[in-house]
Curated annotation (Swiss-Prot):
The keyword Chaperone does not apply. One of its GO terms (biological process) is killing of cells of another organism. Signal peptide: none annotated. The modification Leucine amide is found at residue 12. Expressed by the venom gland. This is Polistes-protonectin. The keyword Zinc does not apply. Shows high hemolytic activity (97% sheep erythrocytes lysis at 50 mM). It comes from Polistes rothneyi. It comes from the Eukaryota. Keywords: Amidation, Cytolysis. Belongs to the MCD family. Mastoparan subfamily.
Length: 12
C-alpha cells in the first residue's frame, strides 16, 4: 500500500 502511494507521488 505504502509503495503504491510512493509510486503515485513519483508519477506527479
Amino acid at each position: 500500500i505504502l509503495s503504491a502511494l510512493l509510486g503515485l507521488l513519483k508519477s506527479l
